[in-house]
Structures are given as C-alpha cells and as structure tokens.
C-alpha cells in the first residue's frame, strides 16, 4: 500500500467511525453491528501503530492520550455559565411568564423550548476549526477546571466536528456528508451517568473494595475529576449538549435552531426536548414528565423552560446570576419515613445554634440519609416534633434532607419532647436570642472553639478563599493542636508544625503551604466572603469590594454609608458595620495584612465594573495584533462591556484589526459608529477615558483602511449567545 493510498484509507476509516459514533450516540440508531464497528477500530489502530506519523490528536483512537495530572488548571469562562431560577409549582411558572410578557411587551409572540434537567455535571467544550481544544467544568459559573483530557474519553463527545444531516447515498458504512464547520464554537452540556450504568459501576467498586458513589450525579462528577484520564475512560459517562456559549461563522436565531445545529454537528441532544407555542402546552408536557420520572434511564430533577427566541433572550437579560428567559420547573422532592433517634445542635461560624435530626438510615433518591435539618427551635415546637417520633423526611431540591413533621398516629408514648440547651455545647456560654429572631446564638465570638472552627472552614471553602487541601479534618487538627485561633493564623503555619503528625509527609505539607500562600492574592470580594460576616454572601461582597476598594475603607464606613449602596439593606449594613467595629475584627485585619494577604482590590478587578466600558457594546472585526478575538471579548466583558457579533444601531464601538470584515466595516460607516483599534481599546481600559476619546469617526476611517480590501465577513466574529444553563 503506497503512502497516498494508506493516508486515504486511514482518513476513510476515521470518517466511517465518526459517522457510526454519531449513529450510536446521537441518533441511537446504529446501522452496523458491534463486531463490524470493532473491526473498523482494529484496522485503524493497526495502521496507526504501523505508521505513527499518521496519528492525529482528533483520531478516534486518541481519546485516552494524556498522562495523569496532579491538579486541574483554572479556566475563565468567556461567557458565564449561570444558574437558573427555580419554580416549585405551575403558579410560579405562570408568574415567571407574566414577568417575561411585561418585559417583552404584551403584544410579543413567545414560544418555548422544554428540556429535561439532567442531574449531572455541567461542562463547556471549545472547538476551533472543528477540533476539540478545551473542555472545562462549570465551577462557580465564572471559573471552572480544565478537564479536557478526561472529557476526550467520553464517547459521546466528538473530538472532531462533522455535519451528519444524512448518510451519503449508497454508502451504508461510508463517511458522512461534510458541511461548513464553525471556526469557533463553544458548546455547553451535561455529563451524566445512566442509572443502570451507575448500579453496575457500584457493584464493581464494591467488589474491588473501593468506595461506592451515593448517586449517579456523584458518580459522574467523581469520574470526570479523576487525575488519570484512563480511569475516566473506564467509567460509563455520557453527554448531552443543550446550548452554545459563543460561535463564529454560523448564526442561529432560536434555541430550537441551536439544538438542531448541535445535533447536526455530531453532539448528542436529548430527544425529549420539545418546542411549544403556548405555555399551557409546555406545562402539560412538564406534567407528563413528572409522571414518567421513575421510568427514565437517567436521573432528572426537573425540566427547564426556555424562551425560544435568542433575540428575546437578549432583550430579557439576566438578574443576579439567573437569566430572565429561562426557569427550572423542579420536580417534587422525594420523601421517606424514618425514626428520629436524637436531636443535636451545631454551632455555626456566626454563633447560630442549629438543631439537626439524627435519624435511622433511610434511602431517599439514591442517597442514604442519617441526618436531617430541623431549621430552628420554633420549627420543632410548632410541629411538636419529639425524639422517638416516626417522621417524614424530604430532600429539598433533591439535595438537602429535612424533617417535614411527625406521624402522630404512630406514637406509642415513649417519645420525648426536646428543648434548646441553655448553654453553648462547645464553650458553655449562655445562649442568647435577640428579640424578633428565631435563632439562638452563642455570643462568645472570639473564643468559642466551634465558631473558630466553622469560621476557618468557611474561610478556606471554594466560595471564599478556595484553599485546596484543607477541609473539616485539617481544620480540626489545626484548632485542637492550638496552631490556629483565627483565619490569619493559617498563614503562620510552617513545616515544623507538621513534623510529627502522621500522614503529613514533606510533599503533602509543601502542597498545603503552597495553597495557603497562593490564597494571599485572592480578589477582595473573596476575602470579604471569607470573613464570614452575617448576611454577606458573594453578591453583597462584590458590591462592597467594588465600592470601597479595600478592607480599610470598608471597615471605616458607617452603617449609613453602607446602607446607601444599591443592593444593600439596613440589616446587612448594620451587620457589616458591627463586624468591623469589634476589636477582634480590627485585630484580625491587622494580622492578615502582616501575613501578606491582599486587602485591597486589584486595579484590573475594580476596572471591570463601573468604568468607561460599562454599558457599552463592542463588535470586533479583523485580526488583532496581540490577542485573539476570544481574548479581546474576555477583556471587554471583564471591564464591564458587552461583545456582539454584528453591527447594529445598538453598537457603540467597532474594534478593527487587520483584514476587517467588509460587512461590519460598511455597516459601521453607514451608521456612523466610532471605530477604535487594539491600541485604542487598551488605552481606553488603561486610562479610564471614554471610548469616544480613542475612537476614529467612521468617516475618517476610510483612508486608514483603504489599502486593506474588505473581505466577506463569512467566518464572523464570536457571536455570544447570551448565557448558559446548568
């Protein structure tokens, strides 16, 4: 076989295998037997083994090709992967629809796409010129983990895109028809595990003495985050695509078109997605799903209702972290009956005493539940919940177990009423209860060991300072040995502390201390979250960081100054001011500074909000000198601006590079839209001047670009299709 013929045969085999993968994973309609498929793979592997120079990264044989890694790199999402607002009943869905109609106008025609809400792990996949170049987890919605090597092992995720609208005529086993592949496309979807596959996996893990997973979602998440891709490859993971983050060269107008495009490109798309013109029909389909829940081959925790039109999605926008154009209609929580063995209290980081139920183990939705929330003392008293009662246990949102109430008819007289203890179980301090509040608190803020432990656990958590390698056991060790009395003491730990501690070898200690040191430069809002101030979560912390810019400025602010900020109410303001008024808080900030922790906002972070780009829409055309279009888009959005894929009256500025697209350039001239180049964009961001100071009027731009012939704008610039769902 000569080289040309060999090359053609190898490529033909790859195309056939990709096509049959599409038939199997996307259409669920294979046209060849497993034996025939295996024969194709064997031939391809044999040819590549004999001629390694023909091996390419996108070959079907190369799904497992990366060595085990120590950790996953962080990935910044260009388009945020947002969460979803939830509805627990049809009334809440209709209320959402009423808000949509008010925002769009009563005469707007609205269609809906209803999709199953798969209970898995949200991921994003980036393809350049049809080749998978990066895959990442959702993470916190803005930053995820690079798990490309592991995602490549999932058979349903194409390594190379194709257009599979039809099989070539007369070619039962032939290659698919090819069409235009987007130069850039970011695909969003869900990695999951079928219930039957999950049960088989647990049997295998148990037989080999390994820890079994609690449910399919945990199994999928754990499998995807294996350090060794070879382990992930052995796990029965699957993938459904449901959205696009950004795209070049292809325009879609609706969510329904998006799903069809994804299917055509070779991605598995859930066949149960439906489009409806009327909300009543969409809700009827949701009810049908609820009745079929236990018949499905995979776990779902609800359905997602989306506005079909992408233009209407853009008009509706986002509130907080939730898109206004979609809602998750959650299924009723699963429930079971168990016996209440005891009620114990936990001490939170702010001193709140929370009662928790210890129950006889019971399986709810695939999870063995031994503890459940009782909320507060009033909740227990109002429902007359007693130790020894048979109680109804639910998992709210299929996640958090809680006690609904007792089954009074099953009482036999042995049940005992419960009362909140008078003193803190951790330090013995008398508990207090403020007027008008339901919570009891331990006021021993600076000394109570339970509060110290909880504050440190909160400080190192992913939503705060995100210090890898420190969990509940490590914090308990630090506190019990007297090494750490507050969060600032973490930065005083040295190798000597661990010299005689079993399980802490040199490498583990080095990694631990490196992670602690690396957290010193976290964004200011993460540090504010980490302090554990009552009522202060990520959103409030971001508002405070953006406005004050440093812990010193925030600490010096009065409650009235804080209350004046949009999004901050009097209760939050009072809590923040009270926290920083405490002597121990002032001492803690001083210790953090001495330890080298950044207590001021980074300039680039502060510039990302409220600067000259805020509220402005940019379009990028041509090749920029020092950055890709994706990087330029990220830069603009990081500094408060928006990026669009086409020029319109709503466009504020056109960023021009070499060989600009003729369509965009001409449209900008027609509309008189100001134009800036990369240097102007960077100067704008760096100087804080308005973009108009950097812009060249469209009428003056012709001479500067006359030597560059306008090109057809076919590939287009990245078109960001709003926000993704999880």
From Swiss-Prot:
Which residues take part in binding Zn(2+)? Answer: 424, 427, 442, 448
Matching entries from SUPFAM superfamilies are given as: BRCT domain, DNA ligase/mRNA capping enzyme, catalytic domain, Nucleic acid-binding proteins, RuvA domain 2-like
Organism domain of life: Bacteria
Fetch the SMART domains from UniProt.
Answer: BRCT, HhH1, LIGANc
Main enzyme class: ligase
Keywords carried by this UniProt record: DNA damage, DNA repair, DNA replication, Ligase, Magnesium, Manganese, Metal-binding, NAD, Zinc
Q: Which Gene3D superfamilies match?
A: 5' to 3' exonuclease, C-terminal subdomain, 6.20.10.30, BRCT domain, DNA ligase/mRNA capping enzyme, Helix hairpin bin, Nucleic acid-binding proteins
| Cofactor section | Mg(2+); Mn(2+)
Residues in domain BRCT? 608-698
Protein's UniProt keywords contain RNA-binding: no
Give the matching Pfam families.
BRCT, DNA_ligase_aden, DNA_ligase_OB, DNA_ligase_ZBD, HHH_2, HHH_5, Nlig-Ia
Q: Which GO terms describe its biological process?
A: DNA repair; DNA replication
Family the entry assigns: Belongs to the NAD-dependent DNA ligase family. LigA subfamily.
NCBIfam families with a match to the protein in the record: dnlj (TIGR00575), PRK07956.1 (NF005932)
Give the PANTHER family listed for this entry: CHROMOSOME TRANSMISSION FIDELITY FACTOR 18, REPLICATION FACTOR C SUBUNIT 1
State what protein this is by name.
DNA ligase
User: What organism does the record attribute this protein to?
Assistant: Roseiflexus sp. (strain RS-1)
Lineage summary: Bacteria, Bacillati, Chloroflexota, Chloroflexia, Chloroflexales
* Gene that this sequence comes from: ligA
